[in-house]
Amino acid sequence: MTRSALLSVTLILGALTAIAPMSIDMYLPGLPTLGREFHAEAGTVELTLTAFFVALALSQLLYGPFADRFGRTAPLYVGLILYVVASVACALAPDIYTLIGMRFLQASGGCAGIVIARAVVRDLFESREAARMFSLMMLVMGSAPILAPIAGGYLLV
């Protein structure tokens, strides 16, 4: 694989892996605003995070077997479409309870990138190269907790 192709693969897989973490950290600065806008208590607003984490954990258990059975592309597209549709539904949620449900679906779709990106690395690279790719992907994903709250705060302004 050429150096430019390797860089492209690293950035794409890193971005797929960073989707769900970005959706957590970008969202945090807006929690107080959500409470005010939906006239909801802090505990109820925090359920949006709980729903996200539960779906993120449980859905990863499904994408692995689906990706093994149906290939990498179809489950990834299903997950990304679910993520985008749920994200739009989150933006249009009329109440906090709809938002909680949509955050659950958003995480269910967003975790496809986490699982399938790792599977693709195992498909494309041998053990030593795979370890290097995993570390590079984590470098890209590691920027999410740094950049996402800044972006989320900027979106609120």
Language-model features: locations:
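Cytosolic juxtamembrane N-terminal segment immediately preceding the first transmembrane helix
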Residues: M1-A20
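Residue-level signature of the transmembrane alpha-helical cores
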Residues: L16, V78-L82, A86, M102, ...
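Residue-level signature of mid-helix packing/kink "hotspots" within the transmembrane helices
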Residues: D25, F53-L61, P145-I146
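Extracellular/periplasmic helix-loop-helix junction of adjacent transmembrane segments
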Residues: G30-L58
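Interfacial helix-cap and linker-helix signal at transmembrane-aqueous boundaries
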Residues: L34-G35, F66-A67, A151-V157
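Conserved MFS/SLC helix-loop-helix module at the cytosolic interface between two early adjacent transmembrane helices
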Residues: L58-Y97
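Helix-loop-helix hairpin linking two adjacent transmembrane segments in secondary transporters
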Residues: T98, L136-V157
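Cytoplasmic helix-loop-helix junction between adjacent transmembrane helices
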Residues: M102-V140
